[in-house]
């Protein structure tokens, strides 16, 4: 009994601590709408330079319990300045007024929200101040209460959705001289790269670069293993441009390995199937020419994007894959989804083999920070989806099979490389 009395204050203290346990969600993990670049977002300072009262700040996370949810906001305001803010969780909104204290942060509590159904929730912060009266610099959103227990949020400054990949197994001993894949974008947020034909030395696909520009990208890595600066790559390790198509830009790339980059600005259409082909032609025991071809929907013919001579090769295509990437991060809350279908490989002697099996993988962000990443089969094609904060996920390494089409790409009237630019 004496022991229990001795432990009682400790037990009560632990219970009190547990009841006050909080989830601190950094401001740098939030998204901005309608302009994803409408304020400055950084890991060091949170959200600053928020001027436009029409701008909304959004957090997304999974609440695993129903019940009361207490929310507060940590921010900075000039001493004596006031700011009125509205926080909306689901369909419920609360407003609060805060007075600044200069360089010190202040906490603005909102009335409790009721979470009726567990699952992903959107937290929308709005300024109710008139134009010209900034709402303050936002540091964090704080959650407490029964509904916050075991909540899952991305707490890292990286706001990108997880990158997702299809890995295609090839029969053992098969030399792959060509890799063909069809790709249909179903969603088209800015800063999306849907990559159709990847292999051990490069990748080929299409990007959404701005509201007015889209590109077809074909890139080939150098040898030597340099991670960032192509200026450090010795001449014998550099890939060399052999040819490029009409209107194609060709140059260097770095910071994700180094190599030769090429792109064609072209307004490919969401919802329409695009066709991609990569070929490998060994020229001697140590060099292979890799070429990327695109079936141009307007010209109704195959066009060359570019060809690169890669050193320390001499073989064919290996490690075939496709991927979808959110390369911007500022709109990582939006869903990206595309269909990948009718994959074929061609051997050096001209035999076509259909690839109907693929396995799923994702980058480190998909391990724990962002679980909204998926692969499956839809309308007879593989699909990749990531972002959107939708429930569920696909396990790493899961294998899928699609129905065979039996339709090999036999219409390959490819342009003569010697006639290319």
Regions found by a protein language model. Give the residues of each.
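N-terminal signal peptide c-region/cleavage motif recognized by signal peptidases
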Residues: 16-18
């Amino acid at each position: 009994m004496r022991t229990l009395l001795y432990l009682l204050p400790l037990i009560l203290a632990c219970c009190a601590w547990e009841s006050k346990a909080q989830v601190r969600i950094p401001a740098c993990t939030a998204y901005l709408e309608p302009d994803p670049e409408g304020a400055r977002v950084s890991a060091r300072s949170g959200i600053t330079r928020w001027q436009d009262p029409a701008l909304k700040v959004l957090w997304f996370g999974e609440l695993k319990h129903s019940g009361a949810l207490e929310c507060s906001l940590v921010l900075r305001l000039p001493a004596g300045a006031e700011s009125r803010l509205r926080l909306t969780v689901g369909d419920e909104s609360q407003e609060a007024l805060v007075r600044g204290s200069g360089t010190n942060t202040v906490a603005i509590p909102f009335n409790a929200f009721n979470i009726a159904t567990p699952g992903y929730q959107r937290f929308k912060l709005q300024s109710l101040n008139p134009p010209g009266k900034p709402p303050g610099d936002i540091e964090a959103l704080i959650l407490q209460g029964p509904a916050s227990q075991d909540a899952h949020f991305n707490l890292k400054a990286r706001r990108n959705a997880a990158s997702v990949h299809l890995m295609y197994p090839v029969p053992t001993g098969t030399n792959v001289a060509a890799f063909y894949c069809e790709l249909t974008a179903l969603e088209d947020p800015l800063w999306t790269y849907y990559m159709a034909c990847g292999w051990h030395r490069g990748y080929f696909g299409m990007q959404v670069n701005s509201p007015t520009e889209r590109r077809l990208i074909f890139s080939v890595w150098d040898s030597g293993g340099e991670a960032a600066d192509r200026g450090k790559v010795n001449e014998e390790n550099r890939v060399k441009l052999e040819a490029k198509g009409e209107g194609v830009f060709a140059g260097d790339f770095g910071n994700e390995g180094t190599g030769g980059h090429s792109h064609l600005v072209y307004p490919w259409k969401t919802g329409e199937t695009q066709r991609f082909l990569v070929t490998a032609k060994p020229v001697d025991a140590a060099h292979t020419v890799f070429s990327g071809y695109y079936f141009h929907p307007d010209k109704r013919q195959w066009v060359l994007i570019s060809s690169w001579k890669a050193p320390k090769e001499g073989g064919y295509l290996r490690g075939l894959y496709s991927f979808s990437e959110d390369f911007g991060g500022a709109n990582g809350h939006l869903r990206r989804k595309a269909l990948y279908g009718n994959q074929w490989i061609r051997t050096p002697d001209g035999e076509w083999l259909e690839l109907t099996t693929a396995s799923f993988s994702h980058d480190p962000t998909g391990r724990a920070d962002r679980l909204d990443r998926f692969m499956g089969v839809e309308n007879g094609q593989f699909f990749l989806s990531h972002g959107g904060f939708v429930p569920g996920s696909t396990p790493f390494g899961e294998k899928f099979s699609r129905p065979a089409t039996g339709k090999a790409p036999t219409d390959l009237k490819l342009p003569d490389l010697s006639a290319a630019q």
